C-alpha cells in the first residue's frame, strides 16, 4: 500500500491515470491500521507536555500544530532546523505563529527528538 500512496503523491495529477484509479478501487475496502499513528501521537504529546510546549492535538491526522516560541513561525522553524528538527511553519497555510509537527515516523525518531525539542525550548528562555 505504501508504494501506491508514494506513487500517487509523486504523480500529482488531479485526474489520476486509469491504472491508479483501478489500484485505488481495489484497495478502498482494505482496513486501515491507525494504531501506530495513535501511539506516536501519544508519545509526541507526552514529550511536548513534559517540556511545556503548547499544541493542538488532532483527532485523525498524522501531525499536530504546535505554537512557535516566537511570532515568526519561519524563524522558529529555521532555529529548529539547527537542532535537526524539521517543522513546517504555519505561514504556508495562511496563519502565523504555529508549526506543523509530523509524527508519521518511527517511535524511536520521536523519542530521539525530545532532547532537541528541549534544547530548542532552552534557546528561548
Specify the residue positions occupied by each region the protein language model found:
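PLP-dependent class I/II
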Residues: 1-125
